[in-house]
A protein has these predicted regions:
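N-terminal organellar transit peptides
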Residues: 1-221
Length: 221
């Protein structure tokens, strides 16, 4: 049993990091109103600092508890890259939902575990072009198309490692075509935890034989 002093407890609640146990709590930056900002520059900056700090201490695994909805695409990619370039192995446990931007974040860690009732929502997102000059608007649309393709590729890479892809004997382009068709037909593609695992968008569900509890995640080396 760990005994925490006041500053360690404050770090968990104010900065989302348990340094002693190498755990990060990724959620929206807490504000005084009822709106949940989701992935934004505030949550991203705190998260990036926490990952860097724990990496400077040691290369022991980091457990990330994620409970955050969608949000800003660029801040999402900043967090995604931070996880991908962590020298320490990263394990993510997702609570409640992985929607839009946070479904992308779910693809970054080495090991991705879902709570049993998590839903995963994947879509292309949206862009704003209020009062933009026509040339600027065209550039924004072109950039958005490239970023949408980048997003699909992130999911395709994970899907290609799944049992489903092996059973269907999918080549990479076949998996990409399937994912794009799901996004085109459904707009918001919503998957249960079990479906997300079957597609390779997560590795397992908490409570399984391999990962029966949160404590079992702490034993991963």
């Amino acid at each position: 049993m760990n005994n925490y002093n006041d500053s360690e407890i404050a770090a968990i609640h104010n900065y989302g990091v348990d340094i002693k146990n190498r755990e990060i709590f990724l959620h929206s930056y807490l504000v005084d109103n009822d709106e949940e900002p989701g992935v934004d520059y505030k949550s991203a900056i705190i998260f990036e600092k926490n990952i860097r700090h724990l990496n400077l201490i040691s290369s022991d695994p980091i457990l990330i508890h994620m409970h955050i909805p969608g949000g800003d695409w660029e801040d999402c990619l900043g967090m995604y890259d931070t996880i991908k370039f962590s020298k320490a192995k990263t394990i993510m446990l997702t609570y409640a939902k992985a929607q839009s931007a946070s479904s992308i974040l779910l693809q970054a860690p080495n090991i991705r575990i879902l709570m049993p009732n998590v839903n995963v929502l994947i879509h292309y997102g949206s862009i704003s072009m209020d009062s933009e000059h026509s040339k600027a608007a065209t550039a924004t649309v072109q950039w958005n198309e490239k970023e949408c393709d980048k997003m699909v590729d992130i999911f395709v890479d994970r899907c290609m490692q799944s049992q489903m892809a092996k059973e269907k004997n999918w080549k990479k382009m076949m998996a990409k075509k399937h994912i794009m068709s799901q996004l085109a037909n459904k707009c918001d593609w919503i998957l249960t935890a079990e479906e997300a695992v079957s597609y390779g968008f997560a590795d397992d569900i908490l409570g399984s034989k391999k990962y029966p509890s949160i404590d079992s995640l702490k034993k991963i080396k």
